[in-house]
């Protein structure tokens, strides 16, 4: 606050009358004085005493505080310009911790300790002498070698572009069909093991698709340069690789293990491996893996089991209650999974391989539209879709709406592929959920903006996923437990 008497030039004598020659300047001076605080006396009295170190004027020091009000808005009013709500945010965090602590204690009292790390092994192996899922992952190398051999022959002209395209299409189709057939036919493979094997083959499919596209672009550029009578610049930069020198097993397998789906001849590389950074990421991976397993066994499984009877009885009020009860642990586990995969795991792999591009996610939590969320929460997949699906469709004359719909259609197919095949049942809930993102994106973009749009995105994430989980669990329970019991 300070001493107002020393900060303003002291006025002596009386003020000019409003009927005198003061005019607008005098009026402006009165407004400034009123906003500044207490006024001096009409006859040039001394200003009010300076406040003490606590910001209050001395008690009993006089009666100079003739005015204590000024024109101002309440802090919660939008016109106040106040934006520091850190204390309220801390209060929300405290309330969230307390409410979830109560739920955790209630769960322990009701069910006891259900966490069993040994039980997790049975999710991956049904028969200790039969390991079909790891064998499927190892067999994926055959498809990688096949794609490499096709590219080697295309580079030297031993195959025509049409023959190479046909071989690549057959190889890519087999990558998706072969593991699905094994999962559906081999009884000893578990749903979790099937999911991991199919995810490995799906990632390989996307990587080899990109590998084929980029090498094809390089051949076109080389042919175009040759037809124009130009020589390819091989000395553009030191330590860079040009086509076809990139066609080596070392280059291929670096790409297959790198945390990206888009192939390049020269990836950005970090100068060294940071051991402390790598150790932190590995510890995070171990900790969050155990945390996710514990939350699923202790919190989600009992909730899902208790949701079967309301579904069977079609008790809609109880179904909604179970859905909301499942939404909290499901969303918490999904957030932990996001951090575990996109920050801990991918950064650990990138650090080991000195892979320089670490943009695996953007600020999707600030999404004010559904479209922004899908563009920023999974950057490796988003880059692949834009580079190898969206832009090629635009170049072939498709509209932006058609290209965007095509991207969601492909995403819906892979979501259904990764859920229905391991569960050995086809209900299209995942496919429908992904395709529903198109009208949802339009609805949120049309009727919600700013914070309301962000709240709508969060609501769709919190409620949408548990609906799909309950649908699949209910159908799986009916198919594998109720139907055999009824037949018996």
UniProtKB/Swiss-Prot annotation:
Activity regulation info: XP620 is a selective DGAT1 inhibitor.
Region called Involved in homomerization, residue ranges: 1-91
Record GO cellular component, one term: specific granule membrane
Region of interest (MBOAT fold), residue spans: 131-488
Modification sites for Phosphoserine: 17-18
Region (Intracellular loop 1 (IL1)): 224-276
Record annotation: effect of changing residue 415 to A: Abolished diacylglycerol O-acyltransferase activity
Pathway per the UniProt entry: Lipid metabolism; glycerolipid metabolism
Broad class of enzyme this protein falls into: transferase
Transmembrane domains' residue ranges: 84-118, 131-156, 162-184, 192-223, 274-308, 316-353, 400-420, 429-447, 450-481
Ranges facing Lumenal side: 119-130, 185-191, 309-315, 421-428, 482-488
EC annotation from Swiss-Prot or TrEMBL: 2.3.1.20, 2.3.1.76
Ranges per topology, Cytoplasmic: 1-83, 157-161, 224-273, 354-399, 448-449
Keywords of this entry: Acyltransferase, Disease variant, Endoplasmic reticulum, Lipid metabolism, Membrane, Phosphoprotein, Transferase, Transmembrane, Transmembrane helix
Intracellular loop 2 (IL2): annotated segments: 354-399
Effect of residue 411 to I: Decreased diacylglycerol O-acyltransferase activity
Consequence recorded when altering residue 469 to A: Slightly decreased diacylglycerol O-acyltransferase activity
Outcome of substituting residue 390 to A: Decreased diacylglycerol O-acyltransferase activity
Catalytic reaction(s) noted: an acyl-CoA + a 1,2-diacyl-sn-glycerol = a triacyl-sn-glycerol + CoA; all-trans-retinol + an acyl-CoA = an all-trans-retinyl ester + CoA; 2-(9Z-octadecenoyl)-glycerol + (9Z)-octadecenoyl-CoA = 1,2-di-(9Z-octadecenoyl)-sn-glycerol + CoA; 1,2-di-(9Z-octadecenoyl)-sn-glycerol + (9Z)-octadecenoyl-CoA = 1,2,3-tri-(9Z-octadecenoyl)-glycerol + CoA
Extent of Low complexity compositional bias: 34-47
Family the UniProt entry places it in: Belongs to the membrane-bound acyltransferase family. Sterol o-acyltransferase subfamily.
Domain notes: The disordered N-terminal region is required for the diacylglycerol O-acyltransferase activity and may regulate enzymatic function via its interaction with the MBOAT fold. The MBOAT fold forms a reaction chamber in the endoplasmic reticulum membrane that encloses the active sites. The reaction chamber has a tunnel to the cytosolic side and its entrance recognizes the hydrophilic CoA motif of an acyl-CoA molecule. The chamber has separate entrances for each of the two substrates, acyl-CoA and 1,2-diacyl-sn-glycerol.
Subunit record text: Homodimer or homotetramer; both forms have similar enzymatic activities.
Protein name listed in UniProt: Diacylglycerol O-acyltransferase 1
Organism: Homo sapiens (Human)
